[in-house]
Amino acid sequence: MSNTDNIFSAPIDKIGDFTFDARVAEVFPDMIQRSVPGYSNIISAIGMLAERFVKPHSNIYDLGCSLGAATLSMRRHIQQEGCTIFAIDNSEAMVERCKLHVNAYRSDTPVEVIEADIREVEIKDASVVVLNFTLQFLSPDDRYALLEKIHAGLRPGGILILSEKYVFEDESSNELLIDLHHDFKRANGYSELEVSQKRSAIENVMRPDSITVHKQRFEKIGFSSSEVWFQCFNFGSMFAIK
């Protein structure tokens, strides 16, 4: 059972950059459910997409796996033989808790939980790759290289599932969607102080792209098609097919 997220509930004199440390890992399920609109729907549908695209004797990658929600959703849906899921995160605290979550369930599909920098991990013989609210935390210069590596490591017909927070070119629309997201957080019990302090902590480490930028990047890398399959306010998920 997850603890309640109250990390930003008291005034903080000097707000540092947001990190996925032990404190965040402890409350992460509560934090993400109350902060990301449609998160449960995305996790469920990642499993459905995996069921459609996983091929026998292929690899599945969950890059930036946090506590393994997407990994577990995929493992529940995979019916193919000879598949391995590689769940990778660079946070020691997340990896340790992810291992506990994965080991709590039996399955014919093995999962390897690995502490590593996803920019340095080899992607090979993959039918499914997931980046679930991960790419936005990489520096813009690293994003293209990672996506290029994923494309190279995917089998023809393989799928990349990319969930992200978005920015929008139209300034008034962008501001409205930001405001609606903050309303969502308030409706889920976060105070004005928590909303404000979390935004200050995360704005320097999370730099989202527009949907247009994502689609142009996919096309340039060589994916055959891409589309948004889910969106709620300024959060959503896309697929890109090799």
Swiss-Prot record:
It is an enzyme of class 2 (transferase). The keyword Cell membrane does not apply. It catalyses: prephenate + S-adenosyl-L-methionine = carboxy-S-adenosyl-L-methionine + 3-phenylpyruvate + H2O. CDD domains: AdoMet_MTases (cd02440). S-adenosyl-L-methionine binds at residues 39, 64-66, 89-90, 117-118, 132, 199. The keyword Ligase does not apply. Keywords: S-adenosyl-L-methionine, Transferase. One of its GO terms (molecular function) is S-adenosyl-L-methionine binding. InterPro entries: CmoA (IPR005271), Methyltransf_25 (IPR041698), SAM-dependent_MTases_sf (IPR029063). Belongs to the class I-like SAM-binding methyltransferase superfamily. Cx-SAM synthase family. Catalyzes the conversion of S-adenosyl-L-methionine (SAM) to carboxy-S-adenosyl-L-methionine (Cx-SAM). This is Carboxy-S-adenosyl-L-methionine synthase. The lineage of its organism: Bacteria, Pseudomonadati, Pseudomonadota, Gammaproteobacteria, Vibrionales. The gene is cmoA.
